[in-house]
Amino acid sequence: GKALLYFEVVTTVALLIGLAVSTFIEPGIGVIRDDIAGGDISKYTQKAAGFSWISFLKENFTVQVLGFSIFFGIFLNYVKGKAKMIAGMQQASQWVFKGLKIVMYLAPLGALGGMAFTIGKFGIHSLIPLAKLMLTVYVTMAIFVFVVLGFIMRSCGERIWAFLGYIKHELLVVLGTSSSEAALPSLMHKLEKMGCSKSVVGLVVPAGYSFNLDGTSIYLSMATLFLAQVYGIDLSVEQLLTIIGVLMVTSKGAAGVTGSGFVVLASTLTALQVIPLEGLALLLGVDRFMSEARAITNFIGNGVATIWLAKHEGEFHQPEA
């Protein structure tokens, strides 16, 4: 219970930081909307003006599926022989993400084509807003790591810089693969060697890859506001709160594999029905570069979460000699 509470609080802080920075810097301002998509967005602005929670829950298939999944998971707790069902679902999930991984290997070719088309049609100046978004995302995640996660580490009597040095080889693996899942076994071994109990590591790290994706949370909130700014959609306070609420749920559906954040972003926009999905084409060209920042932040965040819980549960022992 304490682990889930930690996950929810920290990822919510990540979402709020992403929204705050995007609102202040406005990376989407300056992007020419007609250069992205020529479709009619009036239906989206009409939905924004006539928003209601009843229609939101009734019309959004994504939210319905997520809600069903949550209640189905609760129901499974009371079913005998649930282990086989859970194992089957985990196996199916692995197949899906293996397929996604294969697709993402080809994504750079599509991204290259998209970038070449953008530059050829609109000029090199069209990349400036994308560079602004990338820089904003990287700076925001750095602030989150060294300020928020740094504060959490200090509260545990540890230092964030020392921890980053301790896992530097794993960080290079994550950077090279753009997947925080690639270094999962090594992270668990290092945390146990550092002094965290095996039971805490075995619980927090795997759970964190579904519930504690700090980097993905920052990216989702910033990308959502970026696209809203691109299309000139002035979001109300109620809609911003709705975005936070939806992201608090959909961000838990991402995985530590390359490209999953982009898939979750598409699901989020589908659920919101306020921002045109065509805008995702603009992000495709730079998503691979931002995926590295997401993966590294997710990776560090799960390590810090494990240390925090081990310290607070009295499950942190002297490091091995």
In which residue ranges do the predicted regions lie?
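Signature of multi-pass transmembrane helix bundles
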Residues: 2-161
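Alpha-helical transmembrane segments of multi-pass membrane proteins, especially transporters
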Residues: 2-11, 65, 86-89, 133-137, ...
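Transmembrane alpha-helix boundary and packing residues in multipass membrane permease domains
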Residues: 19, 70, 74, 110-117, ...
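Membrane-interface alpha-helices at helix entry/exit sites of multi-pass transporters
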Residues: 1-6, 101-105, 193-209, 237-238, ...
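Transmembrane alpha-helices that form the ion-translocation and gating core
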Residues: 9-38, 136-169, 173-174, 180-183, ...
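Alpha-helical membrane segments and immediately flanking helix-loop junctions
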Residues: 166-220, 248-265, 289-308
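Juxtamembrane helix-boundary/capping and inter-helix hinge elements in multi-pass membrane proteins
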Residues: 79-83, 122, 157-161, 191-201, ...
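Transmembrane alpha-helical segments and their short flanking loops
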Residues: 221-321
